[in-house]
Each structure stands twice: as structure tokens, then as C-alpha cells.
Amino acid sequence: MDVILSTRHHSHLDSLLIETQRVLEVVFGHPVAQRPSPANAFPNPLLSPKDRRHAAGLMRINHVGEICAQGLYFGQVAVARKEELRRHLLKAAQEETDHLSWCSDRLHELESRPSLFNPLWYSSSYMLGVFAGLLGDPWSLGFVVETERQVEAHLEKHLQVLPESDARSREILRVMKVEEARHADQADHAGARLLPSPIPGAMAWAARLMKVVAYRI
């Protein structure tokens, strides 16, 4: 069984080793997608150097977004009170792993690399996930809803500003946008609580900072 989808009980040492392996794979490695990339439906376009750099910057931002999603979900999983919620988070995390792999592949095709700050992005998101989980399951789901809604909005913006000929990147983001919206809806239906107004604003501010940095570094 895939490591991140396993729900059987482990010893503390086993759990630590599994978590360490998963973090290393997410932050420094290349997680394997369980589904083929949507980009495969389109040929790799010939982009100008300027367009290639721009597309790479956008895809690096989206790659970081998926790194953050992994951190958030697994931080929440670590302290989830109910097995049903834990399974819900793990299922969403698997789709996010596919997104991460697709973005990584596209970055490679664009002759670029992931953000150098991925360890920071992951660790800060993991701590946010733990914090959200400790508040209780309804609040934890509320963080999922807000995160996915914000991601959905920035994906829509990226779809509008990608180089017109970059159909491969565009199709990846289109599929991701659909699935992020579904994650938000599922969390909402599972009993998410609406976050108080200062929290979404703070999350949006942190996301803007991440985008500025990740576009270049």
C-alpha cells in the first residue's frame, strides 16, 4: 500500500521513519503520480526564452502550492481526532501528490527547477496544519476550504496569464483547479466552519509573499 494512504497503526518508530521518508520525497525528491499528467494530451510547445521563463515561474509557484498543500494536510492528519477525517485528508493529499508530480515534470520540461525554499514552505505549512487540527475537526476543515478556495482563485489567474501557446501547463492547471474546488466542496460538506475574517486575510498575505519569492527563486 502507498505510504501516504496507509491507515494501519504503526509503532512510534515506524511512524517516524515513514513520515521522514515522505517528507524527504515531497521536499527533495519527485513523488510518483498515480495518474498520468493531463499535459500528455498536448505536444510540448516551442516557447520563446521570455515565455519559457514566465511559464516556469508560474509553474514553480504552483509547485510550491502543492508542497504547501502536502504540509497542511499532513500536519492536520497528525492530530486529526476522527478516523473519517483522517481518511478524507489522506485521499485529498493523494490528489495533491499527483499535482505536485505534474508540476515537477512540467518544470523539468521548461528547463527550470523547484523553489530553493521548499523546506521552509513545507515546514511552515505543516505547522499551520497542526495548529488547525488542534483547534478541532470543524476548524481544520475550515482551513481546507479557505486554502483550496484561495488556490482555485490563483489558478484561474495563472490560466489567464500563461503564454498562449503553452497548452501543456494550461491543461495541468485546469485539472488542478477542478480538483481543488472539489476538495473545498467536500470539506465544506463534511462540516467545515467558516474561518474568522482575520485568518483568510493573513493566509492571503502569506500566499502573496510566497508567490513573489517562488516566481524567481
UniProtKB/Swiss-Prot annotation:
Gene3D superfamilies: 1.20.1260.10. Disulfide bonds: none annotated. InterPro entries: COQ7_proteobact, Ferritin-like, Ferritin-like_SF, Ubq_synth_Coq7. Keywords: Cell membrane, Iron, Membrane, Metal-binding, Monooxygenase, Oxidoreductase, Ubiquinone biosynthesis. Catalyzes the hydroxylation of 2-nonaprenyl-3-methyl-6-methoxy-1,4-benzoquinol during ubiquinone biosynthesis. CDD domains: DMQH. Its cofactor is Fe cation. Fe cation 2 binds at E96, E148, E180, H183. It is found in: Cell membrane. Its EC number is 1.14.99.60. Pathway: Cofactor biosynthesis; ubiquinone biosynthesis. Fe cation 1 binds at E66, E96, H99, E180. GO terms for cellular component: plasma membrane. This is 3-demethoxyubiquinol 3-hydroxylase. It comes from the Bacteria. GO terms for molecular function: 3-demethoxyubiquinol 3-hydroxylase activity; metal ion binding. Coiled coil: none annotated. It catalyses: a 5-methoxy-2-methyl-3-(all-trans-polyprenyl)benzene-1,4-diol + AH2 + O2 = a 3-demethylubiquinol + A + H2O.
